[in-house]
């Protein structure tokens, strides 16, 4: 029900924006017959909620009975009583990507190890090819 109400509200906003821009659009929206649509989905608590939330706004949700807190930035908890640590806030940022870029020193060490390994392999192959078998050797 709430989703249908939000979709109708969104459609009405789009139609109003077209009407404001001079483009005329004629459409009919279905009427909502449910009486609960007059009550906003979320509303502030009022005087009975003063002091309930320590660092935020006290709200009533239409679908859920009771008071709830909408915490200010940097606070969390049922009554917004806990401070969010700085490191925790950094890790919760959306769309953060961590990429590992090896330092130039590490890259030089790896390239050096590869070059030394190639040199040792070529020396080993060269000496193995040039060795004479024991049977062909002449002892004086």
UniProtKB/Swiss-Prot annotation:
Induction: Expressed in the early phase of the viral replicative cycle. Gene3D superfamilies: Laminin (2.10.25.10). Residues 19-100 are extracellular. The record marks 96-97 as: Cleavage (By host protease). One of its GO terms (molecular function) is epidermal growth factor receptor binding. Disulfide bonds join 45-58, 53-69, 71-80. Residues 41-81 form the EGF-like domain. GO terms for biological process: epidermal growth factor receptor signaling pathway; positive regulation of cell population proliferation; positive regulation of mitotic nuclear division. Residues 1-18 form the signal peptide. Residues 122-140 are cytoplasmic. Stimulates cellular proliferation (hyperplasia)and mobility around infected cells to promote rapid and efficient spread of infection. This effect is beneficial for virus replication in vivo, because poxviruses replicate possibly better in proliferating cells than in quiescent cells. Acts by binding host EGFR, inducing its dimerization, autophosphorylation and leading to activation of several cellular pathways regulating cell proliferation or cell survival. This is Pro-vaccinia growth factor. The gene is OPG019.
